[in-house]
Amino acid sequence: MSKIIGIDLGTTNSCVAVMEGGEPKVIPNPEGNRTTPSVVAFKNEERQVGEVAKRQAITNPNTIMSVKRHMGTDYKVEVEGKDYTPQEISAIILQNLKASAEAYLGETVTKAVITVPAYFNDAERQATKDAGRIAGLEVERIINEPTAAALAYGLEKQDEEQKILVYDLGGGTFDVSILELADGTFEVISTAGDNRLGGDDFDQVIIDHLVAEFKKENNIDLSQDKMALQRLKDAAEKAKKDLSGVTQTQISLPFISAGAAGPLHLELTLTRAKFEELSAGLVERTLEPTRRALKDAGFAPSELDKVILVGGSTRIPAVQEAIKRETGKEPYKGVNPDEVVALGAAVQGGVLTGDVEGVLLLDVTPLSLGIETMGGVFTKLIERNTTIPTSKSQVFSTAADNQPAVDIHVLQGERPMSADNKTLGRFQLTDLPPAPRGIPQIEVTFDIDANGIVNVRAKDLGTSKEQAITIQSSSGLSDEEVERMVQEAEANADADQKRKEEVELRNEADQLVFQTDKVVKDLEGKVDAAEVAKATEAKEALQAAIEKNELEEIRAKKDALQEIVQQLTVKLYEQAQAAAGQAEGAQGAQDAGTKKDNVVDAEFEEVKEDK
Protein backbone atom coordinates (compact mmCIF):
# COMPACT_ATOMS: atom_id res chain seq x y z
CA MET A 1 0.00 0.00 0.00
CA SER A 2 1.31 3.45 -0.88
CA LYS A 3 2.49 5.74 1.90
CA ILE A 4 0.08 8.14 3.59
CA ILE A 5 1.92 11.33 4.54
CA GLY A 6 1.01 13.41 7.60
CA ILE A 7 0.66 17.16 7.10
CA ASP A 8 0.42 19.89 9.72
CA LEU A 9 -1.05 22.74 7.66
CA GLY A 10 -0.25 25.63 9.99
CA THR A 11 -1.12 29.33 10.03
CA THR A 12 2.52 30.47 9.97
CA ASN A 13 4.48 27.26 9.31
CA SER A 14 3.66 23.86 7.87
CA CYS A 15 5.36 20.50 8.28
CA VAL A 16 5.18 17.10 6.57
CA ALA A 17 6.12 13.69 7.99
CA VAL A 18 5.91 10.00 7.12
CA MET A 19 6.22 6.62 8.86
CA GLU A 20 9.58 4.95 8.19
CA GLY A 21 10.77 1.80 9.92
CA GLY A 22 7.95 1.99 12.44
CA GLU A 23 8.76 5.59 13.42
CA PRO A 24 7.37 8.92 12.23
CA LYS A 25 10.00 11.09 10.52
CA VAL A 26 9.86 14.75 9.48
CA ILE A 27 10.58 15.30 5.77
CA PRO A 28 12.87 18.29 5.16
CA ASN A 29 12.07 20.74 2.34
CA PRO A 30 14.51 21.36 -0.56
CA GLU A 31 16.30 24.05 1.52
CA GLY A 32 16.92 21.43 4.22
CA ASN A 33 14.50 23.00 6.74
CA ARG A 34 12.08 20.83 8.71
CA THR A 35 9.23 23.35 8.59
CA THR A 36 8.07 25.53 5.68
CA PRO A 37 6.55 29.03 6.15
CA SER A 38 2.87 29.00 5.10
CA VAL A 39 3.49 31.90 2.74
CA VAL A 40 2.65 32.13 -0.97
CA ALA A 41 3.90 34.89 -3.28
CA PHE A 42 3.03 35.62 -6.91
CA LYS A 43 5.56 37.35 -9.13
CA ASN A 44 5.17 37.70 -12.91
CA GLU A 45 2.80 34.71 -12.96
CA GLU A 46 5.33 32.62 -11.02
CA ARG A 47 4.31 31.15 -7.66
CA GLN A 48 6.74 30.99 -4.77
CA VAL A 49 6.16 29.10 -1.52
CA GLY A 50 7.86 29.07 1.86
CA GLU A 51 11.05 30.84 2.86
CA VAL A 52 11.67 32.34 -0.59
CA ALA A 53 8.15 33.86 -0.57
CA LYS A 54 8.51 35.14 3.00
CA ARG A 55 11.89 36.79 2.26
CA GLN A 56 10.50 39.08 -0.42
CA ALA A 57 7.24 39.94 1.39
CA ILE A 58 8.51 43.47 2.14
CA THR A 59 8.84 44.38 -1.53
CA ASN A 60 6.13 42.18 -3.08
CA PRO A 61 2.53 43.21 -2.30
CA ASN A 62 1.29 39.93 -3.85
CA THR A 63 2.44 37.93 -0.83
CA ILE A 64 -0.21 36.01 1.14
CA MET A 65 0.30 34.94 4.76
CA SER A 66 -1.83 33.40 7.53
CA VAL A 67 -4.56 32.35 5.07
CA LYS A 68 -5.62 29.57 7.46
CA ARG A 69 -7.45 32.21 9.49
CA HIS A 70 -9.88 32.62 6.57
CA MET A 71 -10.62 28.92 5.96
CA GLY A 72 -14.34 28.21 5.79
CA THR A 73 -15.23 31.84 4.99
CA ASP A 74 -16.08 33.56 1.70
CA TYR A 75 -12.83 35.56 1.89
CA LYS A 76 -11.01 36.01 -1.42
CA VAL A 77 -7.71 37.68 -2.21
CA GLU A 78 -7.07 39.30 -5.58
CA VAL A 79 -3.65 38.70 -7.10
CA GLU A 80 -2.64 39.83 -10.58
CA GLY A 81 -6.29 40.19 -11.62
CA LYS A 82 -7.46 36.78 -10.32
CA ASP A 83 -9.43 35.99 -7.17
CA TYR A 84 -8.07 33.19 -4.98
CA THR A 85 -9.98 31.42 -2.19
CA PRO A 86 -8.24 30.32 1.04
CA GLN A 87 -8.61 26.73 -0.24
CA GLU A 88 -6.60 27.52 -3.38
CA ILE A 89 -3.80 29.28 -1.49
CA SER A 90 -3.67 26.40 1.03
CA ALA A 91 -3.55 23.96 -1.90
CA ILE A 92 -0.42 25.70 -3.25
CA ILE A 93 1.26 25.15 0.15
CA LEU A 94 0.07 21.52 0.20
CA GLN A 95 1.43 20.97 -3.34
CA ASN A 96 4.81 22.22 -2.12
CA LEU A 97 4.79 19.81 0.85
CA LYS A 98 3.62 16.97 -1.42
CA ALA A 99 6.56 17.66 -3.78
CA SER A 100 9.02 17.57 -0.83
CA ALA A 101 7.59 14.21 0.26
CA GLU A 102 7.79 12.79 -3.27
CA ALA A 103 11.43 13.90 -3.64
CA TYR A 104 12.26 12.33 -0.24
CA LEU A 105 10.41 9.04 -0.81
CA GLY A 106 11.22 8.70 -4.51
CA GLU A 107 7.60 7.83 -5.33
CA THR A 108 4.33 9.57 -6.17
CA VAL A 109 2.29 10.58 -3.11
CA THR A 110 -1.51 10.73 -3.45
CA LYS A 111 -2.80 10.25 0.11
CA ALA A 112 -2.51 12.35 3.25
CA VAL A 113 -3.76 12.85 6.77
CA ILE A 114 -4.13 16.60 7.38
CA THR A 115 -4.48 18.19 10.81
CA VAL A 116 -6.80 21.05 11.78
CA PRO A 117 -7.31 22.96 15.03
CA ALA A 118 -9.61 20.99 17.32
CA TYR A 119 -11.94 23.97 17.45
CA PHE A 120 -12.39 24.15 13.65
CA ASN A 121 -16.07 23.98 12.72
CA ASP A 122 -17.56 21.94 9.89
CA ALA A 123 -17.04 24.65 7.23
CA GLU A 124 -13.36 25.00 8.13
CA ARG A 125 -12.86 21.21 8.01
CA GLN A 126 -14.59 20.97 4.62
CA ALA A 127 -12.39 23.81 3.31
CA THR A 128 -9.26 21.95 4.47
CA LYS A 129 -10.43 18.77 2.73
CA ASP A 130 -11.12 20.74 -0.45
CA ALA A 131 -7.62 22.27 -0.30
CA GLY A 132 -6.20 18.75 -0.21
CA ARG A 133 -8.26 17.70 -3.23
CA ILE A 134 -7.16 20.77 -5.20
CA ALA A 135 -3.53 19.89 -4.39
CA GLY A 136 -4.04 16.40 -5.84
CA LEU A 137 -4.25 14.63 -2.48
CA GLU A 138 -6.85 12.16 -1.26
CA VAL A 139 -7.43 13.32 2.30
CA GLU A 140 -7.78 10.00 4.10
CA ARG A 141 -8.49 11.63 7.45
CA ILE A 142 -8.78 15.08 9.02
CA ILE A 143 -7.56 14.92 12.63
CA ASN A 144 -7.33 17.48 15.38
CA GLU A 145 -3.92 19.00 16.08
CA PRO A 146 -3.82 18.32 19.86
CA THR A 147 -4.91 14.72 19.21
CA ALA A 148 -2.12 14.31 16.64
CA ALA A 149 0.38 15.68 19.17
CA ALA A 150 -0.82 13.15 21.76
CA LEU A 151 -0.47 10.33 19.20
CA ALA A 152 3.16 11.25 18.52
CA TYR A 153 3.88 11.59 22.25
CA GLY A 154 2.11 8.39 23.27
CA LEU A 155 3.28 6.03 20.51
CA GLU A 156 6.12 4.73 22.70
CA LYS A 157 4.09 4.86 25.94
CA GLN A 158 1.10 2.70 25.07
CA ASP A 159 1.45 0.51 28.15
CA GLU A 160 1.13 3.48 30.53
CA GLU A 161 -2.22 4.85 31.69
CA GLN A 162 -2.07 8.63 31.55
CA LYS A 163 -4.29 11.67 31.62
CA ILE A 164 -2.81 14.31 29.31
CA LEU A 165 -3.55 17.98 28.70
CA VAL A 166 -2.37 19.20 25.28
CA TYR A 167 -1.98 22.98 25.15
CA ASP A 168 -1.60 23.99 21.49
CA LEU A 169 -0.82 27.65 20.79
CA GLY A 170 0.06 27.99 17.12
CA GLY A 171 0.52 30.92 14.76
CA GLY A 172 -3.17 31.73 14.43
CA THR A 173 -5.21 29.30 16.53
CA PHE A 174 -5.38 28.00 20.08
CA ASP A 175 -6.66 24.60 21.23
CA VAL A 176 -6.59 22.64 24.43
CA SER A 177 -7.58 18.98 24.65
CA ILE A 178 -7.78 16.51 27.52
CA LEU A 179 -6.99 12.89 26.61
CA GLU A 180 -6.76 9.54 28.35
CA LEU A 181 -4.14 7.04 27.17
CA ALA A 182 -4.56 3.36 28.03
CA ASP A 183 -3.58 0.14 26.21
CA GLY A 184 -3.03 1.86 22.86
CA THR A 185 -6.34 3.75 23.03
CA PHE A 186 -6.12 7.53 22.72
CA GLU A 187 -9.45 8.86 23.91
CA VAL A 188 -10.19 12.57 23.74
CA ILE A 189 -12.37 13.48 26.72
CA SER A 190 -12.88 17.17 26.00
CA THR A 191 -11.63 19.99 23.83
CA ALA A 192 -11.90 23.78 23.79
CA GLY A 193 -10.18 26.63 22.02
CA ASP A 194 -10.12 29.96 20.20
CA ASN A 195 -9.63 30.07 16.42
CA ARG A 196 -8.65 33.73 16.53
CA LEU A 197 -5.74 33.54 18.95
CA GLY A 198 -2.13 32.70 18.19
CA GLY A 199 1.43 33.86 17.63
CA ASP A 200 0.29 36.43 15.05
CA ASP A 201 -1.56 38.24 17.87
CA PHE A 202 1.59 38.31 20.01
CA ASP A 203 3.43 39.86 17.03
CA GLN A 204 0.62 42.39 16.65
CA VAL A 205 0.93 43.76 20.21
CA ILE A 206 4.63 44.44 19.53
CA ILE A 207 3.78 46.09 16.18
CA ASP A 208 1.15 48.30 17.88
CA HIS A 209 3.71 49.28 20.53
CA LEU A 210 6.33 50.19 17.88
CA VAL A 211 3.78 52.20 15.87
CA ALA A 212 2.67 54.09 19.01
CA GLU A 213 6.25 54.86 20.10
CA PHE A 214 7.27 56.07 16.63
CA LYS A 215 4.14 58.23 16.34
CA LYS A 216 4.80 59.76 19.76
CA GLU A 217 8.35 60.67 18.72
CA ASN A 218 7.85 61.67 15.06
CA ASN A 219 4.10 62.27 14.63
CA ILE A 220 4.02 59.79 11.74
CA ASP A 221 1.66 56.79 11.68
CA LEU A 222 3.62 53.82 10.29
CA SER A 223 0.48 51.65 10.22
CA GLN A 224 -0.60 53.54 7.07
CA ASP A 225 2.61 52.59 5.22
CA LYS A 226 2.32 49.06 3.80
CA MET A 227 6.06 48.53 3.29
CA ALA A 228 6.95 49.92 6.72
CA LEU A 229 4.28 47.68 8.25
CA GLN A 230 5.82 44.55 6.69
CA ARG A 231 9.24 45.55 8.09
CA LEU A 232 7.62 46.07 11.50
CA LYS A 233 5.99 42.62 11.27
CA ASP A 234 9.34 40.96 10.54
CA ALA A 235 11.03 42.88 13.37
CA ALA A 236 8.21 42.06 15.83
CA GLU A 237 8.37 38.33 15.04
CA LYS A 238 12.15 38.34 15.50
CA ALA A 239 11.92 40.31 18.78
CA LYS A 240 9.28 37.89 20.13
CA LYS A 241 11.54 34.91 19.38
CA ASP A 242 14.60 36.68 20.86
CA LEU A 243 12.74 37.39 24.10
CA SER A 244 12.18 33.67 24.66
CA GLY A 245 15.92 33.39 25.25
CA VAL A 246 17.07 36.84 26.45
CA THR A 247 15.54 39.46 28.74
CA GLN A 248 15.83 42.34 26.28
CA THR A 249 16.34 42.89 22.56
CA GLN A 250 17.20 45.80 20.30
CA ILE A 251 14.84 46.66 17.43
CA SER A 252 16.62 48.67 14.76
CA LEU A 253 14.87 49.71 11.53
CA PRO A 254 16.87 52.36 9.65
CA PHE A 255 15.13 54.51 7.01
CA ILE A 256 11.69 53.30 8.10
CA SER A 257 10.12 56.60 7.01
CA ALA A 258 10.96 60.18 6.07
CA GLY A 259 10.08 63.54 7.60
CA ALA A 260 10.66 67.15 6.59
CA ALA A 261 14.24 66.98 7.90
CA GLY A 262 15.08 63.77 6.00
CA PRO A 263 15.07 60.02 6.68
CA LEU A 264 13.76 58.67 10.00
CA HIS A 265 14.98 55.56 11.82
CA LEU A 266 13.29 53.39 14.44
CA GLU A 267 15.54 52.38 17.35
CA LEU A 268 13.97 50.81 20.42
CA THR A 269 14.91 48.42 23.21
CA LEU A 270 12.13 45.97 24.10
CA THR A 271 12.41 44.13 27.40
CA ARG A 272 10.78 40.80 28.21
CA ALA A 273 8.91 42.51 31.06
CA LYS A 274 7.39 45.05 28.62
CA PHE A 275 6.45 42.29 26.16
CA GLU A 276 4.78 40.34 28.98
CA GLU A 277 2.85 43.46 29.97
CA LEU A 278 1.72 44.01 26.34
CA SER A 279 0.68 40.36 25.86
CA ALA A 280 -0.81 39.63 29.31
CA GLY A 281 -4.37 39.77 27.95
CA LEU A 282 -3.54 37.22 25.24
CA VAL A 283 -1.99 34.80 27.73
CA GLU A 284 -5.07 35.13 29.95
CA ARG A 285 -7.31 34.36 26.93
CA THR A 286 -5.68 30.90 26.68
CA LEU A 287 -6.58 30.03 30.26
CA GLU A 288 -10.37 30.31 29.96
CA PRO A 289 -10.61 27.47 27.36
CA THR A 290 -8.11 25.47 29.46
CA ARG A 291 -10.41 25.72 32.50
CA ARG A 292 -13.45 24.87 30.35
CA ALA A 293 -11.79 21.74 28.92
CA LEU A 294 -10.84 20.55 32.42
CA LYS A 295 -14.38 21.21 33.66
CA ASP A 296 -15.97 19.37 30.69
CA ALA A 297 -13.64 16.41 31.29
CA GLY A 298 -14.51 16.39 34.99
CA PHE A 299 -10.82 16.51 35.95
CA ALA A 300 -9.06 18.56 38.59
CA PRO A 301 -5.64 19.89 37.45
CA SER A 302 -4.00 17.66 40.08
CA GLU A 303 -5.31 14.54 38.26
CA LEU A 304 -3.26 15.31 35.13
CA ASP A 305 -0.16 13.19 34.52
CA LYS A 306 1.34 15.31 31.75
CA VAL A 307 0.99 18.76 30.20
CA ILE A 308 2.28 18.80 26.61
CA LEU A 309 3.03 22.11 24.89
CA VAL A 310 2.49 22.30 21.13
CA GLY A 311 3.05 25.15 18.67
CA GLY A 312 5.94 27.61 18.39
CA SER A 313 4.18 30.22 20.55
CA THR A 314 4.46 27.94 23.61
CA ARG A 315 8.16 28.88 23.71
CA ILE A 316 7.12 32.26 25.16
CA PRO A 317 8.19 32.15 28.85
CA ALA A 318 5.00 33.90 30.07
CA VAL A 319 2.88 31.24 28.34
CA GLN A 320 4.85 28.40 29.96
CA GLU A 321 4.59 30.09 33.35
CA ALA A 322 0.82 30.62 33.01
CA ILE A 323 0.05 26.98 32.15
CA LYS A 324 2.35 25.81 34.93
CA ARG A 325 0.48 28.06 37.40
CA GLU A 326 -2.92 26.91 36.13
CA THR A 327 -2.22 23.15 36.23
CA GLY A 328 0.45 22.96 38.92
CA LYS A 329 2.48 20.82 36.50
CA GLU A 330 5.87 21.49 34.90
CA PRO A 331 5.17 21.32 31.13
CA TYR A 332 6.70 18.30 29.39
CA LYS A 333 9.46 19.40 27.02
CA GLY A 334 10.28 16.07 25.38
CA VAL A 335 8.56 16.90 22.08
CA ASN A 336 9.44 19.50 19.43
CA PRO A 337 6.44 21.88 19.47
CA ASP A 338 6.91 22.73 15.76
CA GLU A 339 7.01 19.13 14.52
CA VAL A 340 4.96 16.97 16.90
CA VAL A 341 1.62 17.57 15.12
CA ALA A 342 2.95 16.47 11.72
CA LEU A 343 4.57 13.43 13.37
CA GLY A 344 1.20 12.51 14.91
CA ALA A 345 -0.52 12.90 11.53
CA ALA A 346 2.06 10.49 10.08
CA VAL A 347 1.27 8.01 12.90
CA GLN A 348 -2.44 8.23 11.97
CA GLY A 349 -1.43 7.62 8.34
CA GLY A 350 0.46 4.54 9.57
CA VAL A 351 -2.63 3.35 11.46
CA LEU A 352 -4.71 3.65 8.25
CA THR A 353 -2.16 1.72 6.13
CA GLY A 354 -1.63 -0.94 8.83
CA ASP A 355 2.01 0.07 9.45
CA VAL A 356 1.08 0.99 13.03
CA GLU A 357 -0.88 -1.62 14.96
CA GLY A 358 -2.65 -1.61 18.30
CA VAL A 359 -3.52 2.11 18.22
CA LEU A 360 -7.13 3.28 18.49
CA LEU A 361 -7.95 6.98 18.24
CA LEU A 362 -11.24 8.24 19.68
CA ASP A 363 -11.75 11.94 18.98
CA VAL A 364 -14.64 14.27 19.81
CA THR A 365 -16.73 16.92 18.10
CA PRO A 366 -15.64 20.34 19.45
CA LEU A 367 -19.01 22.13 19.14
CA SER A 368 -22.63 21.14 19.69
CA LEU A 369 -24.78 20.45 16.61
CA GLY A 370 -28.49 20.92 16.17
CA ILE A 371 -31.32 22.67 14.35
CA GLU A 372 -33.44 25.78 14.73
CA THR A 373 -36.87 25.12 16.25
CA MET A 374 -39.91 27.34 16.85
CA GLY A 375 -39.15 30.78 18.24
CA GLY A 376 -35.56 30.79 16.91
CA VAL A 377 -34.38 28.39 19.61
CA PHE A 378 -31.26 26.26 19.00
CA THR A 379 -32.14 22.63 19.79
CA LYS A 380 -29.00 20.51 20.22
CA LEU A 381 -28.94 16.98 18.87
CA ILE A 382 -25.27 16.24 19.49
CA GLU A 383 -23.54 17.83 22.48
CA ARG A 384 -19.97 19.06 22.24
CA ASN A 385 -17.23 16.59 23.26
CA THR A 386 -19.25 13.63 21.93
CA THR A 387 -16.93 10.88 20.66
CA ILE A 388 -16.92 10.62 16.85
CA PRO A 389 -17.97 9.04 14.56
CA THR A 390 -21.50 9.31 15.95
CA SER A 391 -25.14 9.43 14.89
CA LYS A 392 -28.15 10.91 16.69
CA SER A 393 -31.83 11.17 15.71
CA GLN A 394 -34.73 13.16 17.12
CA VAL A 395 -38.37 13.46 16.01
CA PHE A 396 -39.89 16.91 15.42
CA SER A 397 -43.25 18.04 14.10
CA THR A 398 -44.86 20.93 12.21
CA ALA A 399 -45.61 24.35 13.72
CA ALA A 400 -48.74 25.14 11.66
CA ASP A 401 -51.82 23.32 10.29
CA ASN A 402 -51.45 21.83 6.79
CA GLN A 403 -47.81 22.87 6.62
CA PRO A 404 -46.55 21.67 3.18
CA ALA A 405 -42.81 21.73 3.98
CA VAL A 406 -40.34 22.10 6.81
CA ASP A 407 -37.12 24.10 6.67
CA ILE A 408 -34.19 22.39 8.37
CA HIS A 409 -31.70 25.03 9.55
CA VAL A 410 -28.53 23.24 10.68
CA LEU A 411 -26.35 25.01 13.27
CA GLN A 412 -23.16 24.52 15.26
CA GLY A 413 -22.36 26.30 18.52
CA GLU A 414 -23.15 26.62 22.21
CA ARG A 415 -25.55 29.60 22.45
CA PRO A 416 -29.26 29.01 23.24
CA MET A 417 -30.60 31.13 20.33
CA SER A 418 -30.08 30.13 16.71
CA ALA A 419 -29.06 33.62 15.58
CA ASP A 420 -25.99 33.50 17.85
CA ASN A 421 -24.62 30.24 16.41
CA LYS A 422 -22.84 29.31 13.16
CA THR A 423 -25.13 28.31 10.27
CA LEU A 424 -23.80 25.18 8.58
CA GLY A 425 -26.54 24.89 5.99
CA ARG A 426 -30.27 24.79 5.23
CA PHE A 427 -32.47 22.36 3.33
CA GLN A 428 -36.18 21.59 2.91
CA LEU A 429 -38.32 18.51 3.33
CA THR A 430 -41.24 19.18 0.96
CA ASP A 431 -44.56 17.60 -0.09
CA LEU A 432 -45.80 16.89 3.44
CA PRO A 433 -49.43 15.66 3.33
CA PRO A 434 -51.96 18.12 4.86
CA ALA A 435 -52.28 17.50 8.59
CA PRO A 436 -52.97 19.46 11.79
CA ARG A 437 -49.93 20.97 13.51
CA GLY A 438 -48.04 18.56 15.74
CA ILE A 439 -49.23 15.45 13.88
CA PRO A 440 -46.52 14.85 11.21
CA GLN A 441 -43.53 12.95 12.53
CA ILE A 442 -40.27 14.30 11.07
CA GLU A 443 -37.12 12.48 12.12
CA VAL A 444 -33.92 14.52 11.87
CA THR A 445 -30.68 12.49 11.96
CA PHE A 446 -27.18 13.90 12.36
CA ASP A 447 -24.14 11.81 11.36
CA ILE A 448 -20.60 12.97 12.10
CA ASP A 449 -17.83 10.99 10.43
CA ALA A 450 -14.29 10.41 11.73
CA ASN A 451 -13.17 13.66 10.04
CA GLY A 452 -15.70 15.65 12.07
CA ILE A 453 -17.72 16.39 8.91
CA VAL A 454 -21.50 16.48 9.23
CA ASN A 455 -24.28 14.78 7.24
CA VAL A 456 -27.93 15.56 8.03
CA ARG A 457 -31.08 13.65 7.02
CA ALA A 458 -34.74 14.56 7.50
CA LYS A 459 -37.42 11.89 7.02
CA ASP A 460 -41.22 12.08 7.14
CA LEU A 461 -42.04 8.91 9.10
CA GLY A 462 -45.59 8.89 7.68
CA THR A 463 -44.66 8.86 3.98
CA SER A 464 -41.01 7.70 4.32
CA LYS A 465 -40.01 10.66 2.12
CA GLU A 466 -36.42 11.60 2.88
CA GLN A 467 -34.09 14.51 2.17
CA ALA A 468 -30.36 14.51 3.02
CA ILE A 469 -27.38 16.82 2.66
CA THR A 470 -23.70 16.77 3.41
CA ILE A 471 -23.24 20.15 4.99
CA GLN A 472 -21.68 22.72 2.69
CA SER A 473 -21.41 26.15 4.22
CA SER A 474 -22.29 29.27 2.22
CA SER A 475 -18.55 29.58 1.54
CA GLY A 476 -18.16 25.91 0.63
CA LEU A 477 -16.98 24.99 -2.83
CA SER A 478 -19.13 22.88 -5.12
CA ASP A 479 -17.66 19.72 -6.67
CA GLU A 480 -17.45 21.57 -10.01
CA GLU A 481 -15.49 24.45 -8.43
CA VAL A 482 -13.12 22.03 -6.69
CA GLU A 483 -12.61 20.13 -9.96
CA ARG A 484 -11.86 23.38 -11.81
CA MET A 485 -9.35 24.35 -9.11
CA VAL A 486 -7.75 20.88 -9.27
CA GLN A 487 -7.21 21.33 -13.01
CA GLU A 488 -5.82 24.85 -12.52
CA ALA A 489 -3.49 23.61 -9.78
CA GLU A 490 -2.25 20.80 -12.04
CA ALA A 491 -1.76 23.27 -14.91
CA ASN A 492 0.15 25.60 -12.60
CA ALA A 493 2.28 22.70 -11.37
CA ASP A 494 3.07 21.86 -15.02
CA ALA A 495 3.86 25.52 -15.71
CA ASP A 496 6.11 25.65 -12.64
CA GLN A 497 7.90 22.50 -13.81
CA LYS A 498 8.29 23.97 -17.31
CA ARG A 499 9.73 27.19 -15.85
CA LYS A 500 12.14 25.13 -13.77
CA GLU A 501 13.26 23.19 -16.85
CA GLU A 502 13.73 26.46 -18.76
CA VAL A 503 15.93 27.86 -16.00
CA GLU A 504 17.94 24.63 -15.90
CA LEU A 505 18.39 24.73 -19.70
CA ARG A 506 19.67 28.32 -19.56
CA ASN A 507 22.01 27.42 -16.69
CA GLU A 508 23.37 24.43 -18.63
CA ALA A 509 23.88 26.64 -21.71
CA ASP A 510 25.73 29.29 -19.66
CA GLN A 511 27.90 26.59 -18.10
CA LEU A 512 28.71 25.17 -21.55
CA VAL A 513 29.77 28.62 -22.83
CA PHE A 514 32.15 28.93 -19.85
CA GLN A 515 33.47 25.38 -20.39
CA THR A 516 34.03 26.06 -24.13
CA ASP A 517 36.11 29.17 -23.36
CA LYS A 518 38.28 27.08 -21.03
CA VAL A 519 38.76 24.19 -23.50
CA VAL A 520 39.57 26.56 -26.40
CA LYS A 521 42.14 28.35 -24.24
CA ASP A 522 43.75 25.04 -23.19
CA LEU A 523 43.94 23.81 -26.81
CA GLU A 524 45.34 27.00 -28.30
CA GLY A 525 48.27 26.04 -30.57
CA LYS A 526 47.73 22.32 -29.85
CA VAL A 527 45.02 21.53 -32.42
CA ASP A 528 44.10 22.70 -35.87
CA ALA A 529 43.01 26.39 -35.84
CA ALA A 530 39.94 25.49 -37.95
CA GLU A 531 38.62 23.27 -35.16
CA VAL A 532 39.06 26.04 -32.58
CA ALA A 533 37.29 28.48 -34.93
CA LYS A 534 34.41 26.00 -35.35
CA ALA A 535 33.98 25.75 -31.54
CA THR A 536 34.14 29.54 -31.13
CA GLU A 537 31.52 30.02 -33.86
CA ALA A 538 29.16 27.46 -32.25
CA LYS A 539 29.66 29.11 -28.85
CA GLU A 540 28.75 32.56 -30.24
CA ALA A 541 25.64 31.09 -31.89
CA LEU A 542 24.56 29.67 -28.49
CA GLN A 543 25.21 33.03 -26.77
CA ALA A 544 23.02 34.76 -29.38
CA ALA A 545 20.21 32.23 -28.73
CA ILE A 546 20.51 32.80 -24.94
CA GLU A 547 20.18 36.57 -25.46
CA LYS A 548 17.10 36.10 -27.65
CA ASN A 549 15.67 33.68 -25.02
CA GLU A 550 14.51 31.28 -27.76
CA LEU A 551 14.32 28.01 -25.83
CA GLU A 552 14.21 25.58 -28.78
CA GLU A 553 17.08 27.43 -30.43
CA ILE A 554 19.05 27.35 -27.14
CA ARG A 555 18.48 23.59 -26.91
CA ALA A 556 19.60 22.96 -30.53
CA LYS A 557 22.67 25.23 -30.34
CA LYS A 558 23.61 23.75 -26.95
CA ASP A 559 23.51 20.20 -28.31
CA ALA A 560 25.58 21.20 -31.36
CA LEU A 561 28.21 22.96 -29.24
CA GLN A 562 28.31 20.08 -26.75
CA GLU A 563 29.25 17.65 -29.52
CA ILE A 564 32.08 19.91 -30.76
CA VAL A 565 33.39 20.47 -27.20
CA GLN A 566 33.32 16.71 -26.51
CA GLN A 567 35.47 16.05 -29.60
CA LEU A 568 37.92 18.77 -28.56
CA THR A 569 38.03 17.44 -24.99
CA VAL A 570 38.87 13.94 -26.29
CA LYS A 571 41.80 15.45 -28.22
CA LEU A 572 42.92 17.29 -25.08
CA TYR A 573 42.96 14.00 -23.12
CA GLU A 574 44.76 12.17 -25.94
CA GLN A 575 47.48 14.83 -25.96
CA ALA A 576 47.76 14.72 -22.16
CA GLN A 577 48.13 10.92 -22.24
CA ALA A 578 50.73 11.05 -25.01
CA ALA A 579 52.74 13.63 -23.06
CA ALA A 580 52.47 11.50 -19.90
CA GLY A 581 53.69 8.42 -21.82
CA GLN A 582 56.76 10.25 -23.09
CA ALA A 583 57.55 11.60 -19.63
CA GLU A 584 57.19 8.08 -18.17
CA GLY A 585 59.66 6.66 -20.69
CA ALA A 586 62.25 9.30 -19.86
CA GLN A 587 61.69 8.81 -16.12
CA GLY A 588 62.02 5.01 -16.46
CA ALA A 589 65.43 5.33 -18.08
CA GLN A 590 66.54 7.67 -15.32
CA ASP A 591 65.19 5.36 -12.57
CA ALA A 592 67.11 2.34 -13.96
CA GLY A 593 70.41 4.02 -13.19
CA THR A 594 69.56 5.09 -9.67
CA LYS A 595 67.17 2.35 -8.47
CA LYS A 596 69.50 0.75 -5.91
CA ASP A 597 70.38 4.01 -4.20
CA ASN A 598 66.75 5.07 -4.08
CA VAL A 599 65.64 1.88 -2.32
CA VAL A 600 68.34 2.11 0.35
CA ASP A 601 67.56 5.76 0.95
CA ALA A 602 63.84 5.01 1.37
CA GLU A 603 64.50 2.22 3.89
CA PHE A 604 66.91 4.37 5.81
CA GLU A 605 64.32 7.19 5.99
CA GLU A 606 61.58 4.84 7.28
CA VAL A 607 63.72 3.39 10.09
CA LYS A 608 64.73 6.84 11.13
CA GLU A 609 61.06 7.93 11.28
CA ASP A 610 60.09 4.90 13.40
CA LYS A 611 62.73 5.76 15.95
Swiss-Prot record:
Q: Does the keyword Chaperone apply?
A: yes
Supply the alphabetized keyword list. Answer: ATP-binding, Chaperone, Nucleotide-binding, Phosphoprotein, Stress response
- The question of whether Transmembrane is a record keyword is answered with no
Which positions, given as ranges, span the membrane? none
- The Low complexity compositionally biased stretches are 577-592
Residues where Phosphothreonine is found: T173
**Induction, as annotated:** By stress conditions e.g. heat shock.
**Any GO MF annotation of the entry:** ATP binding
CDD domains the record matches? ASKHA_NBD_HSP70_DnaK-like (cd10234)
Give residue spans, biased composition: Acidic residues.
Answer: 600-611
What role does this protein play?
Answer: Acts as a chaperone.
According to UniProt, the name of this protein is Chaperone protein DnaK
Write down the species: Bacillus cereus (strain G9842)
Organism lineage string: Bacteria, Bacillati, Bacillota, Bacilli, Bacillales
Task: Give me the gene this protein comes from.
Answer: dnaK
